[in-house]
Amino acid sequence: MSGAVGLVVKRRSGIAEDVARLVVKELVESGVEVLVDETVDYPSLSGFPRFSISRDPPGRVVVVGGDGTLLRTFLRLGERESPLFMTIKAGKKGFLLDVERYEAVERLRDFLEGRFREVVYPRYRVYLEGEARACMFNDTAVTANNAKMARVHVFVDGDLAMNIDGDGVVVSTTAGSTAYSLSGGGPIIDPRLDVIVLTPLNPVQLFLRSIVVPSGSRVTVEASVYSNPLVVNIDGQYVYELEPGGIVDIERCGSGVRIARFRWWEDYYERLYTRLLAYW
């Protein structure tokens, strides 16, 4: 594989900066042109040409940081064709990043030489009152504001699936099943499956449980006209208000995200639970 490699790095993190410097050193020694994303502000990386993930991403991009860094990068990408991402964990948890920092150089060499498995992750376009807002990677939560009750109706391809009086609902992808949905009692979805998970949050209707639907479904969340004002949170990054009677539509986005995986399926659940226990 040839061509420049872009670098996106978590901000205000000494660990992420140290890992990024190792990555840059290896790339330079390998004769690869290094481009640094416009959001990176470390003086040690200031001497390299800049790029923007939202305008002109190179064909390959290394992301160093945690889940938040990765999710922000994907949101900034918009609906552009995805570069091939390599992800290096330099955050506290990093469920979505499979390369540990101690193996960063070795895996970077594998990345440059094509020794990996490319996995394409679907994303879902989120509409607020008919206007496209973003393509989510993890989840979209429609929740109550100011600790008041949320009343929402959830539809799948036009059919009513849930009436919820409670804290709201989380609509998650397979990748997002270990995030907010899991905290709300939703299932862990094997990463080899391609589905959408609908998880009610603390419903008064105690019989309500998560529903798993096909990835091609169109999910609609309608705020009841009797509901309090709600909040729509996309991937924990973009937040919007939703008035009573407002509608959120979610459907598959045309462009997925390409990620180079190295040991993603090996000991997956062991690694998953190890990272979950890190919250203890």
UniProtKB/Swiss-Prot annotation:
GO terms for cellular component: cytoplasm. It catalyses: NAD(+) + ATP = ADP + NADP(+) + H(+). Keywords: ATP-binding, Cytoplasm, Kinase, NAD, NADP, Nucleotide-binding, Transferase. Its EC number is 2.7.1.23. One of its GO terms (molecular function) is NAD+ kinase activity. Disulfide bonds: none annotated. Its cofactor is a divalent metal cation. NAD(+) binds at D67, G68, R72, N138, D139, D167, A175, T178, A179, Y180, S181, L182, S183, Q237. It is found in: Cytoplasm. It is an enzyme of class 2 (transferase). The active site is at D67 (proton acceptor). Its main location: cytoplasm. It holds the Pfam family NAD_kinase. One of its GO terms (biological process) is NADP biosynthetic process. Belongs to the NAD kinase family. HAMAP family: NAD_kinase. Involved in the regulation of the intracellular balance of NAD and NADP, and is a key enzyme in the biosynthesis of NADP. Catalyzes specifically the phosphorylation on 2'-hydroxyl of the adenosine moiety of NAD to yield NADP. This is NAD kinase. The gene is nadK.
